[in-house]
From Swiss-Prot:
GO terms for biological process: L-histidine biosynthetic process; methionine biosynthetic process; purine nucleotide biosynthetic process; tetrahydrofolate interconversion. NADP(+) binds at G167, R168, S169, S192, I233. The gene is folD. It comes from Dichelobacter nodosus (strain VCS1703A). SUPFAM superfamilies: Aminoacid dehydrogenase-like, N-terminal domain (SSF53223), NAD(P)-binding Rossmann-fold domains (SSF51735). PROSITE patterns: THF_DHG_CYH_1 (PS00766), THF_DHG_CYH_2 (PS00767). This is Bifunctional protein FolD.
Length: 291
């Protein structure tokens, strides 16, 4: 058996087309163009690529895109002042601070300063609480992308499905668990202190790998017919070159799984598409609230 390769690029492109159409309707009805502000502190090359792609795709769907590139030596007070200004800017409905931040900046304080109603990444404690309570909120973009893929594969309910999340980060693992529970899956979270992760994998109908360890999950860990979502993005050396691989050993896993996301081209494109989806949702909510 060879798995269906889930094409995240195609699904993300379809989502962007829907967002572009909805955005045009929203602008026509309200006269308001959704505004997404992205703050980048420092000059990390990978972050620069991510930020540039976010800006390009935001403009393609009709958003106002504003990118603020701040020097690496920006102080905590200066960064917080910029966030407060954007909180109060009526043109902006979504604010994102690109992570990781330079070591001298406190990411927790920075993220908590973003207005929860403009928190496009869903990292503010209020939105985290809303997510676990099952209330409307901004959902972190990568877990949301995974959830949309699973809905396309299984439908709205995951009742009776055993889901294993490998990784317990605030960005992916924990919010992913909340989303899976909302879809009625039976959820297990594995992490660095979990014994015998392969045994847990072999019981899972759905495996979501998000630990940042190249090809950690082997093909013989995967239950026959499972759906595997690989969130990892790792650069490894191959001879005198480098290549991107996920947290799953793709070649062996695809011979066992029913469906699997590749790296690159799987979850990555979905993350940016969901950022745009969240931005439009926030724009609509702000408009309805009259703020």
């Amino acid at each position: 058996m060879s798995a269906e390769i889930i094409n995240g690029k195609e699904i993300a492109a379809e989502i962007r087309r829907e967002i572009k159409q909805e955005t045009a309707q929203f602008i026509a009805a309200t006269g308001v163009r959704p505004g997404l502000a992205v703050i980048l502190v420092g000059n990390d090359p990978a972050s620069e690529v991510y930020v540039r792609n976010k800006g390009i795709q935001a403009e393609e769907v009709g958003f106002l895109s504003q990118i603020y590139r701040l020097p690496a030596q920006t102080t905590q007070a200066e960064l917080l002042a910029k966030i407060v200004a954007l909180n109060n800017d009526p043109q902006i409905c979504g604010i994102l601070v690109q992570l990781p931040l330079p070591a001298h900046l406190n990411a927790e304080i920075v993220l908590n300063t973003i207005d929860p109603n403009k928190d496009v990444d869903g990292f503010h404690p209020l939105n985290i609480g809303r997510l676990w309570a099952g209330e409307p909120c901004s959902v972190p973009c990568t877990p949301l992308g995974c959830s949309l893929i699973l809905k396309r594969y299984f439908g709205d309910s995951l009742a009776g499905k055993k889901a294993l999340i490998i990784g317990r980060s605030n960005i992916v693992g924990k919010p992913m668990a909340a989303l899976l529970l909302q879809q009625h899956a039976t959820v297990t979270i594995a992490h660095s202190k979990t014994p015998d992760v392969p045994a847990l994998c072999r019981q899972a109908d759905i495996v979501i790998a998000a630990v940042g360890q190249p090809e950690l999950v082997k093909g013989d860990w995967i239950k026959s017919g499972a759906v595997v979502l690989d969130v990892g993005i790792n650069r490894i050396a191959v001879g005198d070159k480098t290549k991107l691989v996920g947290d799953v050993a793709f070649e062996s896993a695809k011979e066992v799984a029913a469906a699997i996301t590749p790296v690159p081209g799987g979850i990555g494109p979905m993350t940016i598409a969901c950022l745009l989806k969240n931005t439009l949702t926030l724009a609509k909510a702000i408009q309805q609230s009259g703020k």
